[in-house]
Amino acid sequence: MGREKKQEYALFTAWGASFIATLGSLYFSEIMKFEPCVLCWYQRIFMYPFVLWLGIAVVKKDYRIANYSLPIASIGACISLYHYAIQKIAAFSAAGAACGRVPCTGEYINWFGFVTIPFLALIGFITIAVCSFIVIKNK
């Protein structure tokens, strides 16, 4: 497979991950009525713009977006990882209780005993970061 096709597929995959993450986030808050905590809002701030940015980049085949999406997705992943640690690691749990009106330790979902909303966001950010790295690597 050619370099440009790899870049195209990676960029589209990153956009798809951001689109699914945004739809999932809106589903949980607007349909299921789960109120987001402060850290959830920060994750949304980092995730939602990717739908527009990466969507435009896919249409224009502008692979330079990866230079910006990689660090932004990495920061979002760090926030998600910290939030997940607050939920799952006892030593971090004390920090989550004073997070805001809705405690960051709350687990609206807990599929298979480990898949929570911050974990899903983490997977989305990692997917975007890896795809961005692939785009950069194949320049």
From Swiss-Prot:
TM regions (residue ranges): 8-27, 42-61, 68-85, 113-135
Origin: domain of life: Bacteria
Cystines in this chain: 37-40, 99-104
GO biological process, one term: protein folding
GO molecular function: protein-disulfide reductase activity
Its membrane topology: Multi-pass membrane protein
Family annotation (SUPFAM superfamilies): DsbB-like
Compartments reported by the entry: Cell membrane
Primary site of residence: membrane
Gene Ontology CC annotations of this record: plasma membrane
Family the entry assigns: Belongs to the DsbB family. BdbC subfamily.
Known function: Required for disulfide bond formation in some proteins.
Name this protein carries in UniProt: Probable disulfide formation protein C 1
Source organism of the structure: Bacillus cereus (strain ATCC 10987 / NRS 248)
UniProt gene name: bdbC1
